[in-house]
Amino acid sequence: MKLVLKADRLIDGSSSKVIPNAAVVIEGETISKVCSQSELTEIELAEARVIDSSGGTLMPGFIEMHSHIHCSAESDAYTHITTETNETFLLRGSQAVRSSLSSGVTTMRDLGSRNEVVFPLRQSIEEGIIPGPRLLVAGTPITTTGGHCNTFGTEADSSEQVVRAIRNQFKLGADHIKIMSTGGGFTPGTNVRAPQYDWTTLRDAVKDAERLGLKMAAHCHATEGVRNCVKAGIHNLVHCSWLSENPEELYDYDPEVADQIAEKGIYVDPTLALSHLNKLRGRVKTPDSGAMADPERRFEILRDMWHRGVKFVTGMDSGMTNAHFDDFAYIPEVMVNSMGISPMEAITCATKTSSECLGRDNEIGTITPGKSADVLIINGDPSVKIEALHNVDTIVARGTVIKESGQLLI
């Protein structure tokens, strides 16, 4: 049976225009028609299941670009990671993907979880055993010996070892590769202000990942780490915090490198919402506390990058302390209210731009005939008030109705 979604307006993800009185027709797992409600035929309506949302907005499903689905998102998340069993991680992961889907995330990229967890979970979602978003996985992140996330990462120091680690993840079925190019605040004893790999090692990693058809995302806080990643041709920078090697200087923003990021088409996931949520939830020291020690300066840097043409994508770092799996809507909210871009620009980052970063823009990211039927109906108008994204009324993921008129069906 066909499915017809009707709402007061539509944001298709590819245009800055809002289309009034819109309808989306879905057949199986695919969008077959996008039109005004007046263009729907009597036969289409008679043969279809119709969901009509007065006051609502049709838009593409959210794309969460940065998650760790085996992590707890609780205040003692690091303790959980270092003490729990793979069986517990699987249970946490199954809850995480369900929670994400229930909040409107229809595509989710995991950027570092145990191989024994993410690959079985991806298969379970694909086979319909458990509900979840389309799950794209890196498996274990690649890090140096004792480096950031070493407790669940693959430790590799030389170019040869890093390339071997990439090939192993490819053999297991990874959708992309994650490498820790600098230290991180979540892992005790690592240095967020210093690189873990030189640019030649990263270059060799990128070259082999590209040979295998895989894109590479790099965790980077230190400015020197950012420089190394850009020089090496990393596809996606995660955090991109521009931290100075001198703690007293805090940031060491390099506009020339920002221009190179824009020119090379490198996507940036600034994980903006994590510190915002820590502040809301009363935690002062955060995994990225160094990156947001001066939030106004951080947002000033990001605004400058935006104006230079850098493309931003939407990652929560969900699973890390206080970053819950149903928190996605805070990302575009912070992009609008703190970074200063428009609601429509933030929505495009969360849909179309993120799909392009994944190399899946022929399949997801916009409401276009022929693409996957990943469609939300928002109660309200997020093009005017971005906070409306918290009010997801209806969710369709790959043609299946997950939530209808506020009622969760999974």
Model-assigned labels for residue ranges:
Residues 92-118, 132-143, 174-187, 214-215, ...:
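Divalent metal-dependent hydrolysis catalytic cores, especially in the metallo-beta-lactamase
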Residues 146-203, 238, 242:
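Active-site gating/metal-coordination segments in enzymes
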Residues 187-297, 313, 318-320, 340, ...:
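Active-site core of metal-dependent hydrolases
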Residues 8, 12, 350-352, 356, ...:
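C-terminal cap of metal-dependent C-N hydrolases
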Residues 2-4, 10-59, 80:
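Histidine-rich, glycine-flanked metal-binding segment
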Residues 56-127, 221, 225, 232:
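Metal-associated gating/positioning segment near the N- to mid-region
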Residues 78-91, 147-164, 215-220:
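Active-site mouth loops of central-metabolism enzymes
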